[in-house]
Structure formats: C-alpha cells, structure tokens
C-alpha cells in the first residue's frame, strides 16, 4: 500500500523481495561487544565497536570472520547489542563463528519467546502486537522518535487525529512463570 501511495509522487517504483536471501542474528547482553570484538575484521578492533564510533541506532557494514554483515546497533532486549544481517549462504558459518567466540564469554542461545518477553519488560513495541497501521507514534507511546518541531510526511494527519488511545506498559505482580505475549486483555 505504501508503495502504491508513493508511485503517483515519484513515478514508477519497482520492488524486489530479497527476504529469503538474508538472515539475521541478534547478539545482545553485557558481553556482546566482547564477542564481536573477537571476530571482527577491522584495523582497530579495540574501538570499532565503541559507543563513539558505533552509537545506538546506527548501522554499518562490517566483516565478521569472512562474512559481510550489515550491523545495526540495537537490541530488542534493551541490552547492549547488535542485529547482524548477513547473506543466507553465510548463515551456518557466521553462527559457528559467533558460537565459538561467545563460548569464552558465557554466551547462551535464547529463543524468540525469551526475546519477546525481554522487549516487553523494557517497553519496546512490536509491529503486529502493539504497533500497526492503526496507531500513531504518539498513541504507541513513542514520542522520542517523533520531533514535532520539524515537518515530516504525515505530521498534519497525526496531529489532526490527536491521541485517541495510548499504549502503555503495566507492571503486574503475579506468578513468576507468567510470560506475556502482548495485547493481553485486562
């Protein structure tokens, strides 16, 4: 739908689905930087992953071992971390490389449910759960990502709607083994 909306403005738009050509690993936790530092190919491995050279929400092309990676400095768990987007044909190689490097740092594998639980604990939103085309950034409680002092596409429409509902995080005292899915009824 978004592409159709923009075609009138920009002319012909061509879309190519490369979903099956790329994989992604999420590496997160207090020692994520140490794991990457052990396998990164860079003239200055000591500082290439520093907060100054690779700040939060930035993206860079790096090389881990022999694998080209589009790295994004973000972790859905709210911890120090990176998303490591890589060619699918390199996935097994990269997994083995990271697993070996991570072993000496105590790295453990976690699944999507654990990651989902951790992101909710940090009040991170997910498309298809808390977020969708029906909620504005202000309704999703994401004001830090919207600068209302600047002009942007959709600003007038968002302001005209106002805040009809608001997504918020509730802390519930209850059983220790209750894993949230998101959008639970209260």
Regions found by a protein language model. Name each.
Residues 1-186:
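Conserved, structured C-terminal
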